[in-house]
Each structure stands twice: as structure tokens, then as C-alpha cells.
């Protein structure tokens, strides 16, 4: 049931957004990431949380959503992983993107790291 809630939440938040190159509705990207997580991490004890995080991974960066709304709707584990995947634009300006990515990857939880790798495929 939480998965359906996440799909609806993501669709509402990304409504009207499209992928830059393809022009497809933006929700195709997080939906594919959630599918790939299911394919490659199907045996994970936190599969549902990983897939929900995949669905929500860009809602803070690209919509009016904040971490508190994610936590209220989906819990602290999912909120924490979404935050790990959310870029801090101010920090990127401060230290540069290569250094930011290096610091982010080193401090990321294994679940967020897996999600990051999958959505970069």
C-alpha cells in the first residue's frame, strides 16, 4: 500500500515535468529506477523502502517538496535515503562538483549508494 502511495505522490509532485532529452514524462525515470532496484535487489530485506526511495529520489530537488513532507508521509528511513540522494546546490557552488560528489559518495549509506549507481545506468 505504501508503494501505491509513493507512486501517486511522485506523479503528483512531478506533474507536467518532462525529461530533457527525450521529452517523456519525468516520472518514467524514477519508475524505471524502482523497477531496476526490484530486478537487482529483489532479495533485499528493505526492497520496498529502496523502491519507494527510487520513486521519490528527485522530489526534493525538482519540486516544492521538502524532507519533512517525505518523512511525514513515508518515514525516516526513506526520508534519510532521499536526502542522501539530493544534491546540495549551495555546497556544490562552495566546493565544486567533483569534490562534492567525492564527499557525498564516501559518506553515503550502502542503500543510497546502490540507488545512485542504479539511477546512473
Residue ranges and their predicted role:
Residues 1-121:
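Active-site helical microenvironments for divalent-metal-assisted chemistry
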Amino acid at each position: 500500500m505504501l508503494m501505491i502511495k509513493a507512486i501517486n505522490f511522485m506523479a503528483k509532485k512531478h506533474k507536467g515535468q518532462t525529461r530533457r532529452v527525450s521529452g517523456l514524462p519525468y516520472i518514467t525515470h524514477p519508475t524505471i529506477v524502482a523497477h531496476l532496484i526490484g530486478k537487482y535487489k529483489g532479495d533485499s530485506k528493505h526492497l520496498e523502502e529502496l523502491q519507494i526511495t527510487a520513486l521519490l529520489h528527485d522530489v526534493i530537488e525538482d519540486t516544492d517538496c521538502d524532507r519533512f513532507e517525505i518523512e511525514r508521509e513515508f518515514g525516516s528511513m526513506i526520508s534519510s535515503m532521499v536526502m542522501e540522494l539530493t544534491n546540495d546546490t549551495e555546497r556544490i557552488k562552495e566546493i565544486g562538483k567533483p569534490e562534492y560528489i567525492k564527499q557525498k559518495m564516501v559518506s553515503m549509506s550502502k542503500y543510497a549508494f546502490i540507488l545512485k549507481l542504479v539511477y546512473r545506468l
